[in-house]
Amino acid sequence: MATLKQIQFKRSKIAGTRPAASVLAEGELAINLKDSTIFTKDDSGNIIDLSISAGGNISGNVTIDGTLRVNGPINNFGNFSTSGQITAGSSISAQVFRALQGSFYSRASTGETANAHLWFENADGTERGVIYARPQTTTDGEIRLRVRQGTGSTTNSEFYFRSINGGEFQANRILASDSLVTKRIAVDTVIHDAKAFGQYDSHSLVNYVYPGTGETNGVNYLRKVRAKAAGTMWHEICTAQTGQADEMSWWTGNTPQSKQYGIRNDGRIAGRNSLALGTFTTNFPSSDYGNVGVMGDKYLVLGDTVTGLSYKKTGVFDLVGGGYSVASITPDSFRSTRKGIFGRSEDQGATWIMPGTNAALLSVQTQADTNNAGDGQTHIGYNAGGKMNHYFRGTGQMNINTQQGMEINPGILKLVTGSNNVQFYADGNISSIQPVKLDNELFLNSSNNTAGLKFGAPSKVDGTRAIQWNGGTREGQNKNYVIIKAWGNSFNATGDRSRETVFQVSDSQGYYFYAHRKAPTGDETIGRIEAQFAGELNAKSINAVENFKVNGLSTLVGGVTMSNGLNLTGGSSITGQVKIGGTYDALRIWNSRYGAIFRRSETSLHIIPTNENEGENGAINNLRPFSIELGTGTVSMLHDVHLGNSGSSTGLLQVSNSLKTIKMICPVTINERNAALTLDSPSSSSANYLQGSKAGTKSWYVGLGGAGNDLSLYSQSYGHGLVISDNFVSISKPLKVGNAQLGTDGNITGGSGNFANLNTTLNRKVNSGFITYGATSGWYKFATVTMPQSTSTAFFKIVGGSGFNSGLFTQCNIAEIVLRTGNERPADLNAVLYTRTIGAAFKNIAVNNVSGDTYDIYVYAGTYCNQLACEWACTENATISVIGINSSTQSPVDDLPDTAVNGQVANVLNNLVDSGKGKRYEAESEIAINSQTGIRIRSNADKTGSVATMLRNDGGSFYILFTDKNDTDGAATVNGEWNSKRPFAINLTTGEVMMNNGIAVRSAALFYNSINVKDNGSINFDKSGANPRNMRIFHAGDASRGNRIEIADETNYIAYFEKAPGGANRFVVNNATVSGVNQMNSFGVNTSNALGGNSITFGDTDTGIKQNGDGLLDIYANNAQVFRFQNGDLYSYKNINAPNVYIRSDIRLKSNFKPIENALDKVEKLNGVIYDKAEYIGGEAIETEAGIVAQTLQDVLPEAVRETEDSKGNKILTVSSQAQIALLVEAVKTLSARVKELESKLM
């Protein structure tokens, strides 16, 4: 039995202390209170541990209320159950670990700085992989998945799951066999090298369904990029808006503000400004995009920056080469501004080659005028048989108008019409199938003596060349043909050969005249000339060297010279001059009784009779009845003269030489130019007049009644008349002409029109004068008028303009002013200025009532209104005074009177323009036409081919109509009714526009509302140029396939949009490849998109990438934001797991180094804590982390803390792990120094 001593306990409070054998008796107990262990001494004197760790068997249950510590293995051959935790210092092994409540926890081993792991091992204990959670910061957490790369590898692959930015997942590579669904993806490079054939790199096929116009939801925002923080931001957008073509476009701005480029679903591409192709050099300078200084703001350059197309203005662009304009393209022409060359060359003109056989270098589509020459086209440089030919065709004419004419070299000109042709050769030859006919005279203009018409000798026997005038049938034409020809018979083989050369004029009935040279006879060396006339010969002059023989009657019209007198016995009619010289008695006219001889004696010509019965040969007698003095023309009749026939064998005027009297028994009429009846008084003081009397009583006289020079026409019967004095004409009674009478008061009355009463007419006259307002524009006082109410009217016409420049025709202007008073309810004066052009002298008008019915009129005049012609008139109850009329330059007033009232200015429709401008009518107000057919526009008056267009409003519809074309000049078609075509009409009730004869749109067309294609119609695109097929867009479908919009060519469909009967939408492309960059709204990859906005989803509807603002790109997982990219920062709202994190720390990037002082003290002020953390301030805690508090770190090391924003935009603090490491490094170095110091002391 043990003694009491043996069951008493010896105690120790020092951990790890075992009792010595000397202090215990056998069986005596000792307890270590610190370690909770019991010891005793066995019979061998050894100290043994009585705790469970000493071994032994326990039969039955063991209840331990405290801690069970087992330093060795625990072998359990049954079930192991615990209601609490199992804590192992090393590891716990089992075949299977199963969490019946659904949770496994792995806790970091050493506070908040160690990892929490879940390991995967091979059978030999080597690592396969591990899932572990990294230490947390105050804001971030991270779980990593590390996988060993094979049993023979020493490297691992790690995958990170981070809490930042709403959650991030990081892997060197993500491989999804089916799909990867996420709201946001942040990558440097997306590689699709191993994708299957036919797969797309990405999808953004949004399924927006929107009502109304869809202007907003019809936009798919694809990408937004820039190169630097302050760089231009580019937006890639796909649109499918109602009323617009589907389009991909690229915009710039913080938001899509400025559209730069676009490509539509019909293949059209548009750029904001210009396009440069093939101009890039190294480093991509801005100058590669074209030379704006040379090419302008809008251009297309090719190859270099100053070659291409340059836009100039609406409808006009230039072809530019090397910075120089070489051609301008306008709406109506192609204008070459440099030397134009058309040719075919394979080396830019170094060598030129022929065009293809039967092809031209330049063809003009002149077949439009339906000419039937060849193919109707004009060809320049046409290869026909290897030779260059040129063809000009058309139903009109070709005009060549050059100052020095036209040269054809070599000189061959061939004119062809059907089977006929005429050829002109430079050697002078003309060859014609038909006779050459001249519509006008042939004039040989050369001054040399060889110019003339020459006829070669014909090659045919007995042939001759003739000039022939064909006979006609109209008035004034010759009936028979007339021929002039030369021939002869000297070379005849037989017969008469005496006529060497014959010149003959004949018609179809025989010869008129011939002259021939006879062959010489006898001793003659030159044959004589003979002429023969077949009929009468009428000649102005005939000079016969030899015999002159006339068989019939001869009429000599010209001069006849007879050197030995002339005896005419058969009568002679001479219409020309007869010259008789060398004799005094030149001409005798005689009969058997008397002869009358025309005799010239020195300076006189006499007609002298012969003595009786000496008519033929007698000499002159002594009578001189008629003589003319040839020097003075004085005619002398020295015997009695009787002029006229009184009916009683005496003359009406009888001059008696013997009685020295003149008797006149008839009225005298002097009716010759410069004829006069002269009364010559013997002295200047004598009276000189014609006196009239009746029955011996003086009744009138005309002349000078005394010594003065006043001429009187005086009626002695009435006692008054007309006196013409030196400075005036006096009349004492009114002067009457017809019914018109000039009174002694100066008034003219009794006439017609203005002369019914001249004083009244003058009172109503239009006054005129001039005014000058000079170089200064402004308000001028123009006139003062007195105009009673009810009513009076005045008008002014001002002719001239503002300025006087050559070529500015608008300065030749007419302005008119009309003033009219009111009806006294109230009293007023209306003023209207009618003007015609911008160059008018007067621009505005104002009226100021001075008092009563008196008004001042003011006008606003332009500059340089010099020398304006002015007319004015008014009703009889009004008066006008024009200020400055016919006077010097007027000055403008400083200001209009306060009581002045503006009148109205009316612009008169006119088409006056300055030089160089197209004439047109301009109006600043509407023009109302009260006719259903309001305007008719004729293309070329009433000429052939002219056509008229008309604007018509019949009350139901508005039409644009046109007539047929005029067939001939002056035809009435162009002025007649419209034809049956209705190219354009507007229903005036519904507003519907009808184009009943088709429509051709040559440029872009904009439709701001719907386009309805009815009756299964289609939109067709005809092939042209290099396009191989026709294209069309049409509406198709049936009950099984629903509705389709289909794009097809002549062979097959290309693509169609379909809404299936079930409501699903499809877009199908027939075996097509879509390349390039497309722009669209939000879309999903193998899923729909629920993120909206500018986003891409992957796999599920709320996981993907989304742009949430300018410079903000977020990644979502299950609609939770896990990551954000923005300028300067990268945010993760979840933990980030990575195999390693490398932060740029190159010393070459750093400067201004300073040590972290008192690092250990700073560390001791920090607290590592475990906490629950929310995603944003005020949000729910979403995870438990370990870390430090940013505010505490900021107190000791502010450089390690930075302010940023949480996902809700709240300002929060973040910490730098690199800064913390630097702080800990310095603290460890300080602690290490202290340990070394303590170790040195212990040593």
UniProtKB/Swiss-Prot annotation:
InterPro entries: Gp34_trimer, Gp37_trimer, S74_ICA
GO cellular component: virus tail, fiber
Family stated for the protein in its record: Belongs to the S16-like long tail fiber protein Gp37 family.
Renumbered residue ranges of the record's region Interaction with the receptor-recognizing protein gp38: 1140-1143
UniProt record, GO biological process: symbiont entry into host cell; virion attachment to host cell
PTM (free text): Proteolytic cleavage and release of the chaperone in the host cytosol stabilizes the folded protein.
Originating species: Enterobacteria phage K3 (Bacteriophage K3)
Coiled coil: none
Protein name from the UniProt record: Long tail fiber protein Gp37
Residues of the site described as Cleavage: S1145, D1146
Location in or out of the cell: Virion
Subunit structure: Homotrimer. Interacts with the receptor-recognizing protein Gp38.
Regions that span the bilayer: none
Any Pfam family the entry gives: gp37_trimer
Keyword 4Fe-4S: no
Disulfide bond annotation, renumbered to this chain: none
Keywords, comma-separated and alphabetical: Host-virus interaction, Viral attachment to host cell, Viral tail fiber protein, Viral tail protein, Virion, Virus entry into host cell
